[in-house]
């Protein structure tokens, strides 16, 4: 009971707003991402090469825009206003996909809107960390709870996405995603705080830290390994819905159920990994995870 009362005091007010926004933005994102390849192939009529090109352009644009926005938000400006702007772009992106079926428009305007919109979630976590630091709260615990909200959103989002897309159409699904982003925007505007900017390290020191890190062989190997692992996972998310429906002839909705189930299993897996990492070691944990991926694929 004491634990529940303590958590209640920690998670009221602004903290509850942070978790609700993370959950709702996660739901909106989970409505769009799992069905995108199906949308491009069936609704837009894009061939496999053009579907892959869309993801490539989207990824490159997302990296460039996210880096630019992160650099700006870390140095100056109100992070909350930036999140609101990203949510506004997310609304525009969802409405564009809801009512447009022209490939060239989607790969240009849609990708640019999505690149800005995708920066909302990392900026939200950064704002939450800054607020937790400024209010002398437990940052690690609060961040973990917020990440759990995101995982929970991916348990619900993919099955809901395929249900809406297959039964009511992609226009309805994207419109609902836009509505969720509008609600998130309102919560951010009226419930989340602005946090005073903390003085940043000098530019010279930052350059030295970045250079020293990249010159470390272990850092480079970790970067390459992470890139390869994320490449495999991204290929799976893109191709799995099409593989289930086209090659296996199974119901399209099964893809959403599989993604949601995987996200649900991910929550206890992350908790167990955090518990056993001190006993097994981070390196052994990573090797085990990669071996599991090899067996899966």
Predicted regions, residues:
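Juxtamembrane intracellular "pre-TM" segments in multi-pass secondary transporters
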Residues: 1-12, 193-225
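Helix-loop boundary and gating motifs at the non-cytosolic
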Residues: 4-59, 220-221, 225, 230-251, ...
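Hydrophobic core of transmembrane alpha-helices in multi-pass small-molecule transporters
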Residues: 23, 103-121, 227-228
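Transmembrane alpha-helical segments of major facilitator superfamily
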Residues: 53-62, 146, 150, 257-266
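Helix-to-loop junctions at the C-terminal end of transmembrane segments
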Residues: 64-78, 165, 269-282
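Structural signature of the two symmetry-related core transmembrane helices
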Residues: 81-96, 178, 284-297
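Cytoplasmic helix-loop-helix junction between adjacent transmembrane helices
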Residues: 111-148
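Symmetry-related core transmembrane helices of the 12-TM Major Facilitator Superfamily/SLC fold
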Residues: 172-190
């Amino acid at each position: 009971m004491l634990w529940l009362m303590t958590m209640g005091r920690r998670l009221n007010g602004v903290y509850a707003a942070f978790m609700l926004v993370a959950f709702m933005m996660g739901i909106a994102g989970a409505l769009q991402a799992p069905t995108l390849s199906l949308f491009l192939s069936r609704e837009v009529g894009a061939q496999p090469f053009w579907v892959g090109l869309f993801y490539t352009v989207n990824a490159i644009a997302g990296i460039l825009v996210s880096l630019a926005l992160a650099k700006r938000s870390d140095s100056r400006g109100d992070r909350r206003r930036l999140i609101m702007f990203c949510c506004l772009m997310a609304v525009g992106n969802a409405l564009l996909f809801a009512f447009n079926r022209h490939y060239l428009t989607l790969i240009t305007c849609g990708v640019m809107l999505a690149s800005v919109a995708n920066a909302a979630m990392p900026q939200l976590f950064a704002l939450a960390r800054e607020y937790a630091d400024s209010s002398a709260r437990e940052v690690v615990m609060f961040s973990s709870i917020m990440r759990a909200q995101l995982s929970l959103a991916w348990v619900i989002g993919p099955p809901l996405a395929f249900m809406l897309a297959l039964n009511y159409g992609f226009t309805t699904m994207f419109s609902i995603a836009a509505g969720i982003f509008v609600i998130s925007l309102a919560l951010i505007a009226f419930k989340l705080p602005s946090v005073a900017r903390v003085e940043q390290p000098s530019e010279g020191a930052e350059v030295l830290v970045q250079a020293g890190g990249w010159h470390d062989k272990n850092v480079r190997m970790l970067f390459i390994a992470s890139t390869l692992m994320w490449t495999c996972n991204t290929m799976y998310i893109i191709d799995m819905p099409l593989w289930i429906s086209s090659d296996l002839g199974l119901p399209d909705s099964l893809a959403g159920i599989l993604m949601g189930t995987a996200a649900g299993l991910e929550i206890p897996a992350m908790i167990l990994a955090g518990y056993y990492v001190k006993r097994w070691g981070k390196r052994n944990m990573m090797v085990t995870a990669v071996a599991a991926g090899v067996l899966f694929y």
